[in-house]
């Protein structure tokens, strides 16, 4: 995903050098949560059972962001099944932190 983001950023730089913009979010780096499908990546929603299922297409939100000129460069961790419970954990990655209360 990161390599594709670098390629997209270079393409957007080329457009900008020609005086063109891809949209109102031209070149803005955007992260998406792991519940959104991005072609060629997994959308696990924090579940091990989805780890090897590679998305064949983008979620509508991802397509909208790309159409507006964003650069999607990373997917961020989510608690298992997107359910909010304490602690926010996933069997795939490290502890998911709550941004307002970091000790939880």
What are the language-model segments listed below?
Residues 1-104:
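Gly/Ser-rich catalytic/binding loops embedded in alpha/beta enzyme cores
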């Amino acid at each position: 995903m990161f390599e594709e983001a670098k390629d997209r950023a270079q393409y957007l730089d080329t457009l900008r050098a020609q005086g063109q913009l891809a949209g109102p979010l031209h070149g803005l780096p955007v992260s998406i949560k792991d519940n959104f499908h991005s072609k060629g990546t997994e959308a696990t929603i924090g579940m091990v059972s989805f780890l090897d299922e590679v998305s064949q297409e983008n979620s509508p939100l991802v397509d909208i962001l790309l159409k507006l000129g964003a650069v999607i460069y990373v997917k961020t961790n989510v608690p298992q099944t997107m359910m909010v419970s304490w602690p926010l954990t996933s069997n795939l990655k490290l502890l998911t932190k709550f941004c307002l209360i970091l000790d939880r």
